[in-house]
């Protein structure tokens, strides 16, 4: 459905795209293959979301705006990681950023999948198990 798409250039998952770039840069994956791989992923992401909804906190399809924002976030994360990884304080900052992004992903996954969370809202403000 067109109205159910994510039309935002940047959202909380932009952190996750940036953090993935940090991990790849720290793993010594060269910039061009990493960035091209991410563009390729963005091209198939919606299809993967449709087939494997359980691992996505938000399985709505992305509009072109969001794909562009994800690519920008990834590239910015890679460039920032390259610059910051040269110093111990930079490495600490990058580690914290990756941990924050992982927390965002896990928190949203727990919030959107009732099979992970024993507590569910009933729609009346009450919570049931």
Predicted regions, residues:
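Bulky hydrophobic segments
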Residues: 1-64, 68, 72-129
């Amino acid at each position: 459905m067109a109205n159910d798409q994510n039309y935002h250039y940047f959202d909380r998952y932009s952190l996750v795209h940036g953090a993935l770039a940090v991990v790849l840069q720290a793993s010594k994956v060269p910039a061009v293959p990493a960035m091209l791989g991410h563009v390729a992923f963005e091209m198939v992401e919606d299809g993967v979301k449709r087939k494997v909804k359980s691992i996505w906190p938000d399985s709505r399809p992305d509009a072109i705006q969001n794909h562009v924002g994800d690519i920008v976030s990834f590239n910015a994360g890679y460039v920032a990681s390259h610059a910051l990884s040269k110093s111990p304080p930079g490495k600490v900052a990058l580690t914290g950023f990756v941990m924050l992004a992982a927390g965002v992903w896990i928190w949203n996954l727990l919030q959107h999948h009732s099979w992970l969370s024993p507590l569910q809202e009933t729609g009346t403000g009450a919570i049931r198990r």
